[in-house]
């Protein structure tokens, strides 16, 4: 039949149609030749199929196979007149294009989800939550998390993933450090913060500027108070030496008040109940009226030992003497203090009272019947002045030791 239709040559081979695009509207016959071993013995055969009309003007191809070409069993020849090639599909093995196959493509897709961006986010969250951490700590936690999530991975693949995770964590830390989100000092990693916009950054800088200016003011107040203390102490020492030279003898023991001390001032009509401990280091006062507490520095200022620097009423002669009582590096500060009133002295002693503080009896009713004071030579004293300069601590200690020795002798 094929020979009568002109499809077979005289030598028995199939004739190839060369000019098939004469009329795109005509139906085209496609022939598929299959190896005899693949033909069903029950009599089912592959018959030529006639395709419908095609509206696309594309050259139609005829898929031809020869009976002499070997073909494996369970293999289908897939061809189409619209495709220029033919390929064989096996029925025993699933196609690699299946999204459910556990091949390289699927595993590669899983690893693509653990890229640098993914690990940067994870590392950023870890460091932000901890505040201060290290590379090993972050890497170990992430390895533990991903290893627990991927239990089906083989041991050799798990080791590879752990190395990959640690490398990604290292890269992510470098990226975050380059963006100034974290800082690294030796092995310690600290969280700085996420980048902000210009307006917010400007606002944060302004807040930081105000905070630092406030700290500078506090430090200036501390420095001024320390300068006043040094001037008052040195001026007192010079006055005592001058008095001893004039009297040609030391002052009587009962007329000496050792530093530090406090003075309690109240009305003559106030009833005072005073209790003293056995070691004479603690005194308990009960007042039925208002009273004032003054520390030693306040008393020295009222005596004029600060040369008027605390009130800005320093004369040229007092300024010259005050400048001679301080180190040369502090002389400009003394000049500035003399030009204006020193105000807002910053007090750092915990539980202290300001100079010349006034109390009332009602202020002492919250869980206490009175006030507790310490002896002038006691170490438990807490006054409002800043710490005594170092150059005078030794003298005070020596005087206190002598005083204690005299008490023991008595």
Curated annotation (Swiss-Prot):
Keyword S-adenosyl-L-methionine listed: no
MF terms (GO), sorted A to Z: cis-regulatory region sequence-specific DNA binding; DNA-binding transcription factor activity; DNA-binding transcription factor activity, RNA polymerase II-specific; DNA-binding transcription factor binding; protein domain specific binding
Name used for this protein in its record: Transcription factor Dp-1
DNA-binding residue intervals: 113-195
Region listing for Disordered, in residue ranges: 73-116, 370-410
Comp. bias regions, Acidic residues: 394-410
Organism from which the protein derives: Homo sapiens
GO biological process: anoikis; epidermis development; negative regulation of fat cell proliferation; positive regulation of DNA-binding transcription factor activity; positive regulation of G1/S transition of mitotic cell cycle; positive regulation of transcription by RNA polymerase II; regulation of DNA biosynthetic process; regulation of DNA-templated transcription
